């Protein structure tokens, strides 16, 4: 047990230590300063030339958003066409068939918005061709989209007064070529050395210890898993994600994959400080996020390593913790850490089944996604925190009787309205769709039965499964309580709607706020200016997040996770 805790501490320390140099490097990339990756410049110039892009052309926030939305619309059509026709495309040695239109819609939307919700199993639901040219392609593009959006906001924050926030296409390309691709190659090389498959052969016939023959799926897993983790995508190459021994073979690969989830979101927060030359602001934000993250780690690790009281009552020893739904090669501690790392970000990959975690662990996993602010997805995670900074600045300004200001710009009614809509959209979407699904389950059982029954668990946990699904969609996370039968018309379509609303409306609002503030006249700091880089303001922001985001979900948790915990 002590060794497991040491492993948890080592992984967290590694993330924090490496985030600092990576954050400095990311800031240099977006500012166009000299870096070791300048050798990629000729490749980037070819991309710009082929695509007809002028990387030096500045965009205002409306042009920036237009480019972002057009890009995503194009790739959505691309993905739909390939998924519904994959059975007739090459690189399909196992003969997997095409996806149905509703499943393809859900899959395409999910990967396009960086959620990677999977209502299919990777081995049988996709081919090698669509794994590479839909899934892996989307995992690079969507991660780079979020990073580009944050780069635009950083540029607007660094300028005193400007009408432009940079070039979306330039930020998108350098995010791929200079950040995501190099890190993916490093992680992929480690995975190959540890035994993750990388090839295009079909299923391999093996003889098990029991003497039975079994077909084991293979494929280019080592190419896809790194960006799955680094881009906070999370969509597993295999159906059970990183629980699978070929996707995550050893404790070393588990450490590397877990580190890969959080390293860029952490680094992006610090990059903000380097880019804007406001390191204290970045440290303040980083400190609040890290505190919330560590609270979750402590709760989940203690819950999972402490075992299940129901099993204790049977007189069964639980020296290794609550091992239901966990891999013996990884242990309860590493699984508990991963469950927090994957939910404080929008990653959603798993190395154990969240549906089998203790009730309080499940509550922490959901709360991380419902708050949706602690580190979050690459780029967009900090942008969610940015929304609450605007709200906290406005409230603080009213409390001291001064016009609210952030980084020398007045925060007025227009920005506040947008921030409020973005902040309230998240709980609204989750709770409304959970209520709809619960209503249908209770009052239209024939419809539910026609779709396979939906729930494997009734009562408190059944509500948790529905709540988790929509929470995961709204947070662009993609993990799930897998007791829910979600590959149905109802869940495919409703989850797709939640995914679209929860991805693009917040990004539009956050980029709009940054663009509007950037155009305003810069006001030099004075003795009466509210300092946003202090511990006091960090606590204020934390309280605002807790009140607006966390408390909105208390009633539904009282009926699900908390009630289940008290019933043990």
Swiss-Prot record:
TM regions (residue ranges): 3-23, 64-84, 133-153, 179-199, 255-275, 281-301, 375-395, 418-438, 497-517, 536-556
- Does the UniProt entry include the keyword GTP-binding? no
Show the Pfam families listed in the entry.
KdpA (PF03814)
Q: Where in the cell is it found?
A: Cell inner membrane
Q: What GO terms are given for molecular function?
A: P-type potassium transmembrane transporter activity; potassium ion binding
Sorted UniProt keywords: Cell inner membrane, Cell membrane, Ion transport, Membrane, Potassium, Potassium transport, Transmembrane, Transmembrane helix, Transport
- GO biological process entries: potassium ion transmembrane transport
Recorded GO cellular component terms are: plasma membrane
The answer to keyword Protein transport applying to this record is no
Q: What is the protein's major site of localization? A: membrane
Q: Which domain of life is it from?
A: Bacteria
Membrane topology value: Multi-pass membrane protein
Q: Which NCBIfam families match?
A: kdpA
The entry assigns this protein to a family as follows: Belongs to the KdpA family.
Q: Subunit details for this protein?
A: The system is composed of three essential subunits: KdpA, KdpB and KdpC.
Listed HAMAP family? KdpA (MF_00275)
Q: What does this protein do?
A: Part of the high-affinity ATP-driven potassium transport (or Kdp) system, which catalyzes the hydrolysis of ATP coupled with the electrogenic transport of potassium into the cytoplasm. This subunit binds the periplasmic potassium ions and delivers the ions to the membrane domain of KdpB through an intramembrane tunnel.
The name this protein goes by in its record: Potassium-transporting ATPase potassium-binding subunit
Question: In which organism is this protein found?
Answer: Bacteroides thetaiotaomicron (strain ATCC 29148 / DSM 2079 / JCM 5827 / CCUG 10774 / NCTC 10582 / VPI-5482 / E50)
Corresponding gene?
A: kdpA
